[in-house]
């Protein structure tokens, strides 16, 4: 992750990332939050924003952020990594498309989807997927172009391939099926 440098070793990632972002652009506002995300905190935090970018490395956090984003009718740009592969989707309750839990109804069994810390990630991949997420966010903010709402873009850095698949809303989804 190029945002973290040797000078930041020993510093919590949230603060080293904050310092690097401000060093690149001192005209931005960064709000670093160093705390575990609980349902109460997520509800309060997500309420402050119009658009959610979710790039956590665990299913529990992804499910929680998705649940709150759907409840608050906020679009969520989701990015995930695994070794050489990255995935990106836009889940937008206002467009009545699927939510994250429609696509991943339950957490994979232990060992089937190792974390980034366990399996490792091709070093440039977080930057590639993060940049794609930023592009999706800008399209949503500017209301321009075609977003990945209802689709998943899968980038395979090992083979240099990109593919896109359509995603379907589940009528039995415990998170979004009750939305009209």
Residue ranges with predicted function:
Residues 1-180:
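Adenine nucleotide-associated cytosolic modules
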């Amino acid at each position: 992750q190029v945002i973290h440098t040797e000078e930041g070793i020993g510093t919590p990632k949230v603060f080293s990332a904050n310092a690097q972002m401000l060093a690149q652009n001192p005209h931005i506002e960064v709000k670093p939050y160093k705390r575990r995300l609980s349902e109460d905190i997520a509800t309060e935090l997500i309420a402050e924003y119009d658009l959610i970018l979710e790039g956590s490395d665990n299913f529990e956090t992804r499910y929680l952020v998705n649940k709150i984003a759907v409840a608050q009718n906020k679009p969520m740009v989701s990015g995930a990594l695994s070794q050489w592969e990255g995935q990106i989707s836009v889940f937008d309750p206002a467009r009545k498309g699927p939510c994250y839990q429609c696509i991943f109804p339950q957490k994979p069994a232990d060992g089937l989807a190792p974390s980034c810390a366990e399996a490792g990630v091709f070093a440039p991949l977080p930057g590639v997927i993060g940049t794609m997420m930023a592009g999706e966010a800008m399209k949503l903010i500017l209301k321009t172009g075609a977003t990945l709402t209802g689709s998943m873009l899968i980038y395979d850095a090992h083979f240099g391939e990109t593919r896109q698949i359509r995603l379907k809303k589940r009528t039995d989804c415990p998170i979004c099926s009750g939305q009209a």
